[in-house]
Amino acid sequence: MNFFKRLRLHTRLLLRSKFVLISLILLLNLGLLLGIQIYRDPAFPGSLISSAAYEFGLHKHGPYYNDNVDDLKRYTFMGLLTLPTSEHDVYFNATRVLVYKLKHHPETKSKYPVHVLVMKGVDEWKIERLRLDGAEIIMVDQIKTEDLIESGLSIGMGSYRYQYMFTKLSVFEQTQFDKVCILDSDLLVLKNMDDIFDTPYVYESPAEPDMFSFPIFKKPDDEEDYQFSDNFDAYGAPRSEFYPYLLGACDDRNPGHATPPEESETFNAGLMLVHPSSLHMHRIKKIARYPYMYDDARMMEQSLLNLAYNKYGWFPWTRLDFSYNGVWVTEEDLPYLRAAHGKFWEYDNTEFPQILTAEWHKAFGELLAFHDYVVE
């Protein structure tokens, strides 16, 4: 083959290569245009572009914020320890079991930090013990009933220990975190629960709240019927500033419920997933002033929060899968539960399957053995 024939052959090959390259560029541009169109089209809210934006941290409050290793500390599990200060405080031991399950147990331990809100006045040795157990401690003041409610009003507290439970509201002040899963000490973790943090924020308000579906209440010395309505002037901020928000919880339920349980009007506050917010804390305190609006606070913070995040209002609570908080556990519930809720340290309690008593005491024994063998 002479020189000119070779030159013509190479020229043809080069032209073909350029044609292929140009074709690829055109196809890529068409794909990009299609992607942009999908992103703009409200019929495709979960587009690849918007998902990528979350993945790469462009939306720092988006539901994928925890995918980044550097962001793990922005989410946390959180317990609560209040008074009394006695060596035989069963709730102290229960808090230790909770921390052990979330920090060290091979089947349930979390990749997220574990904090404990500790009310000022708790014995220092208990605080130090929780630190050695692996918890990070946040000291908080007691939120007293008299500091919240209007002078002259009273509450129908169901238990002496309930007097400290408004202190749990301090979780809304922990704005160093984006999401907090706060758990009562009598929750026994049975399976890993890290995916609870995948629960998305609520970014938009309802079109219009169904105020007529709110519970009816009466004011003291007044026989008129009233229903709750948010007063944003009293809160000192427009409604739009309260978004995004998050209060996720499981349906409250009664003994003998079906499995899975039916949806309820109210949630159980033994486990909540919240987006801490000073504005929401201020709003909650304003609502708390009038306990006659929320059943005289018979269930303390649970009664209050069920009004503040009523499903018919501007800030409806987010329903979590029932498996995260097994209330009034039945035998049928057990295979599904990630956490069971009850005083399982009580040997003679027949309100729940006895295997949970064995599980709790097994976990307590494991934590004692674990820390005996760990150099502190």
Curated annotation (Swiss-Prot):
Locations listed in the record: Cytoplasm; Nucleus; Membrane
Membrane topology: Single-pass membrane protein
Keywords assigned: Cytoplasm, Membrane, Nucleus, Transmembrane, Transmembrane helix
A GO MF term: alpha-1,3-galactosyltransferase activity
InterPro entries, alphabetized: GNT1/Glycosyltrans_8, Nucleotide-diphossugar_trans
GO cellular component, one term: cytosol
Chain segments annotated as transmembrane: 19-39
Chief location: cytoplasm
Family the UniProt entry places it in: To S.pombe SpAC5H10.12c.
Name recorded for this polypeptide: Uncharacterized protein C4C3.09
Protein species of origin: Schizosaccharomyces pombe (strain 972 / ATCC 24843) (Fission yeast)
Upper classification of the organism: Eukaryota, Fungi, Dikarya, Ascomycota, Taphrinomycotina
